[in-house]
Amino acid sequence: MWENRRTNEGAKSVTNEEVVMAGDRERETARTSTSSGLPLSQEYGPESAAGRPSDATGTAGSYPYTRGVQPTMYRGRLWTMRQYAGFSTAKESNARYRYLLEQGQTVLSVAFDLPTQMGYDSDAPEAEGEVGRVGVAIDSLADMEQLFDGIPLDKVSTSMTINSTAPILLALYVAVAERQGVSRAALSGTTQNDLLKEYIARGTYIFPPAPSLRLITDVVEWSSAELPKWNTISISGYHMREAGATAAQELAFTFANAIAYVEAAVARGMQVDAIAPRLSFFFAAWTDILEETAKFRAARRIWARLMKERFGATNEKSLLCRFHVQTAGSALTAQSIDNNVVRAAYQALAAVLGGAQSLHVNGKDEALALPTEESARLALRTQQVLAHEAGVAGTVDPLGGSWAIEALTDTIESEVLALIAETDRLGGAVAAISAGFPQRAIQDAAFAYQRDVEGGTRVIVGVNQFVDEAVTTPPIARIDPTREREQVASLKSFRASRDTAAVAERLDAIKVAARGSENLMPHLISGVKAGLTVGEISGALREIWGEYRESLVL
């Protein structure tokens, strides 16, 4: 979220007198469209359902799963509270994970620093100043062991938000499990492993699309045989939404990428029903409760129909759109950060009303820095209050049947399908990205949003209306700069302890496999066990495949 966070700088502020007048105006008028610009009727009724297929909604746990992927939803099991965390060194992040587990979090979600995401070791010139800043620095197997020290990997589910270097980090995770005596069959978790959205919005790509798709498919193929409980790709709309996409664009470009991944796996010889059950999704939750709830309902219906009608899937699990939700980082403001607590709570409510399987709530200070421990705890408590006090988890799809929600669900579905059809017309996701189609659409939506903010037609409380005159500087988390030097020293010590002949042999084996068509995962696991670092493996693959250079899209 850091790279793409929308800013509200330059937006007009108002005086206290103007605030009172604005309050009067707010009582008289309200927005007539959703946050994404979909028109809202003043009142919805039975006529809004005219022409809707009788099976469009159904019941939870049955096709097309509009109302939920399980019959009982949260009555059977609450959503997973998966707070995203990671900073500085493996030792410090390990302490934060233990703290979160002690506070009631049930799973882990790992944030990696930019050098790790981009395939650079901590002592690389490109990494200087970025080590441990926006996530944890992981260079080697020693770091990965430290990260999960005292945390049995067969007792937790771990999500790793990592893309270009996802196969390497997964190899490190598997190697740590082996050292803990944990079988591969017992490992559960997720690698994001979604490169196509990096070309569209986020930008942490290394290799061109073709070898990137090959790496993704290697992970899917290997994991389907070796890690039966592992979600091999978390296909992500979140980052595109953070870059400015509308709700419909978020779903459409996510599903277009998912289609490309499934087609690549099928072309490798895999069966749809062997791989699709381990695909999961990652979406954003914005503050527009009605639109977001409808979006999540539409997502389930669209994916179920795509898998059944387009790919011929017959396994019920292949049809399920299981998704993680994170509240919208780009909706947080640097001004009046206490308002962000309210925003995040409403966003979390939308995720739960929409039937999310897991949820991360952002800390109130994340427009400024990584969250403090206090902020992270409050974010977790927000989820716990929502789960145990708000009364929204006791019935399945509580807004289902609302004329407004059903109409918005249909409208979003229609827009999504039109965008997928246009992507298909261009030749699929990879060709559409090369043509700049999704990038341009998102840029246009982001521009329209910011224009409305700066013009005052879109109210951002505390930014362009209802501005607090008293400005305070909240305490924020800061990364100790000495930690970077410690990480570099630790890396050098690790390198000095290795069997250099074994390291060279394993690196050569990876290069040979990369030039051919052999699955790279076994070679990566052998390599990290021999002592190869993230940067060394990434550097070797750069030699073989080159680096992707983004084209300017206007």
Region spans (language model):
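Active-site capping/gating regions of soluble enzymes
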Residues: 236, 252-261, 268, 277-462
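Conserved active-site and cofactor/substrate-binding residues in soluble primary-metabolism enzymes
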Residues: 60, 91-95, 138-142, 164-171, ...
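Weak global preference for isoleucine
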Residues: 138, 151, 162, 168, ...
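Flexible, glycine-rich loop/tail regions that form catalytic "lids" or insertion modules at the edges
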Residues: 4, 22-50, 59, 63-65, ...
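Generic secondary-structure signature for well-ordered alpha-helical cores
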Residues: 106, 149-153, 175-183, 217-229, ...
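Poly-acidic low-complexity segments
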Residues: 104, 152, 183, 194, ...
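Catalytic alpha/beta active-site cores
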Residues: 2-286, 291-292, 310, 317-326, ...
